[in-house]
């Protein structure tokens, strides 16, 4: 079956949000909705998700599901805003509980913080099947970038989160907690078992100069030409390349705000006694920054102003 897919690009975080529609029933799912966030002022805004909501309303579409491919570290989720406006069940992979447990400890969350994934309406397990209208959908666990990463196969459309990028960009970093380059390679090869004509939709596109941003590729295109993971690249070669590359990457700009909100299902931390919610930035003693610090802030706090893409 062939769902209709409309994709919305969030320029500040290079993120694609996808609206997936069963044309027979006008039921929909929204994959990876984005909340605008200005780090300097600590201000969240709903401009991006309002465009998605307006599209759904204008097309008279009803979202059954609001699907997260993982707890993102580079943008904040707008899932609660979308659910409040139009309904739909929020869902993520069951591995979120491991991610919640890690960050609850690493960032010293409030004692009442739950690490059972109950901030989401549903936790998917590998191979689980569901529907969007009459469209068959299946969950494929794709760990490697993060422990909770999943891909959604909806009809002939595959939504891979950060598991793969466009072929000329490659693959996602694996230096976050629970990340593993070997696991990512195995996840990619599992996706490559799907038919080559399967449409593949990415969560991010860091387009090289001279190319427009793209949301869609295919399994066949990825197998032929992905610069990191095309056919013929061995597991050992991928691990060596990915590990070396990750050592050169800085932490994402919105790392700390994003993980604190996203592991809570897109909801900010509880307000403190003055009625204001705060986002933490851990700090360690000043030392010379070393090459290859990468995302080490997740294990040893580094200034959150360090920047880097997800590739």
Name each model-derived stretch.
Residues 20, 32, 70, 82, ...:
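Divalent metal-coordination and catalytic microenvironments
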Residues 5-8, 19, 126-154:
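Core dinuclear metal-dependent hydrolase active-site scaffold
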Residues 13, 37-38, 71-76, 97-100, ...:
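Active-site environment of divalent metal-dependent phosphoester hydrolases
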Residues 2-62, 151-160, 167:
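Conserved beta-strand hairpin/beta-sheet module of binuclear metal-dependent hydrolase folds
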Residues 35-43, 47-135, 224-225:
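Active-site HxH/HxHxD metal-binding segment of metal-dependent hydrolases
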Residues 31, 62-71, 90-94, 142-144, ...:
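Active-site neighborhood of phospho(di)ester-bond hydrolases with catalytic His/Asp-centered motifs
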């Amino acid at each position: 079956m062939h769902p209709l897919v409309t994709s919305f690009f969030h320029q500040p975080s290079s993120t694609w949000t996808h609206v997936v529609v069963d044309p027979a029933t006008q039921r929909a799912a929204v994959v990876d909705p984005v909340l605008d966030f200005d780090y300097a002022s600590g201000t969240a805004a709903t401009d991006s998700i309002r465009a998605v909501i307006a599209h759904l309303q204008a097309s008279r579409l009803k979202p059954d599901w609001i699907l997260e491919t993982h707890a993102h570290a580079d943008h904040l989720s707008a899932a609660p805003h979308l659910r409040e406006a139009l309904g739909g069940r929020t869902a993520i992979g069951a591995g979120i509980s491991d991610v919640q447990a890690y960050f609850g400890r690493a960032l010293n969350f409030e004692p009442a913080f739950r690490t059972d994934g109950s901030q989401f309406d549903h936790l998917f397990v590998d191979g689980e099947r569901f529907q969007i209208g009459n469209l068959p959908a299946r969950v494929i666990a794709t760990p490697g970038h993060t422990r909770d990463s999943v891909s959604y196969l909806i009809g002939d459309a595959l939504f891979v989160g950060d598991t793969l990028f466009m072929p000329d960009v490659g693959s996602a970093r694996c230096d976050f907690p629970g990340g593993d380059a070997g696991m990512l390679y195995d996840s990619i090869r599992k996706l490559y078992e799907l038919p080559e004509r399967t449409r593949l939709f990415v969560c991010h596109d860091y387009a090289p100069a001279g190319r427009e941003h793209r949301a869609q590729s295919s399994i066949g295109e990825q197998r032929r030409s992905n610069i990191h993971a095309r056919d013929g690249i061995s597991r050992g070669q991928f691990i060596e390349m990915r590990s070396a590359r990750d050592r050169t990457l800085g932490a994402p700009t919105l790392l700390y705000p994003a993980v604190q909100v996203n592991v809570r299902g897109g909801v900010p931390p509880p307000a403190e006694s003055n009625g204001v919610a705060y986002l933490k930035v851990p700090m360690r003693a000043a030392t010379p920054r070393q090459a290859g610090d990468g995302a080490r802030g997740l294990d040893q706090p580094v200034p959150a102003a360090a920047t880097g893409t997800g590739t």
